[in-house]
Amino acid sequence: MISLIGILIVFLTVFGGYMAAGGKLGIIIKSLPYEFTMIAGAAIGAFVLSNHTSGAKHTLKDIKKVFKGPHWQPGDYHDLLCLLFELIHLGRQNAVAQEEHIEMPESSAIFGRYPRILADYDAVEMICDTLRSASMNYDDPHQVEEVLEKRLEAQMHHAMHSTHALQTVADGLPALGIVAAVLGVIKTMSSIDQPPEILGKMIGGALVGTFLGVFLAYGIVGPFATRLKSVVEEDQNFYALIREVLVANLFNHATNICIEVGRQNAPGHVRPSFGDLESSLKSLKQAAE
């Protein structure tokens, strides 16, 4: 919703200010279809040219995140800590029983209690791979932390592709607007024998291209790229929390301490309160006994 409000403000202030200053929309509306076709068409073509097929599809899919916001909500962080508590607690009591859950998470009763997390491939794989490695005696906390950090960096690099692709388009739009404007000037020069009032309209129409390129770059596409980047970074905190808890587990801290390490490393606006989380953990512990 906030993104839609932002777009509305951009349009109202730009065109409202133009009309309030005495500008007429007629010349813009008349030239818009042709200028927009040239600029948008060239931008789309350059986008397709500079991205592989999967990258282009990934970018188009990610645009909806601009409006939907982060995938992971405060309740998901609470559920993640509860899930990790159950798995770590079970692993310390019965490693064989834990193995059944991490080898087949889709049929696990523990994972099944947290369907939003279970539906996320990256989160489930990160949890299961790390716990599986620990059961195979790859349990040096510093080495595991380094491996997880590299994994998160690779995941972040992939997730940021859409942001970079959109920003590249935004950076190129002003230049494409100039291209459209130059073509308009060339057209105008071929009619140099026309009266000044006609030439004025033709030059004004040509300048619509420059306006449109800059407007789309800094008013629409650029902010889209920035917003998408913030959403990706926000969601990445979810996976970083998994790393913090699982590394704390390898240091052989008490299970509750491992979870508290994760809770305190969660961003403040999504961090579960200590009381609510403690109450949930007590209920889970009682149910397991």
Residues of each region from the PLM?
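Large intracellular
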Residues: 19-160, 234-289
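Alpha-helical transmembrane segments of integral membrane proteins
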Residues: 1-9, 34-38
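Helix-termination/interfacial motifs at the ends of transmembrane alpha-helices
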Residues: 5-8, 12-27, 147, 151-229
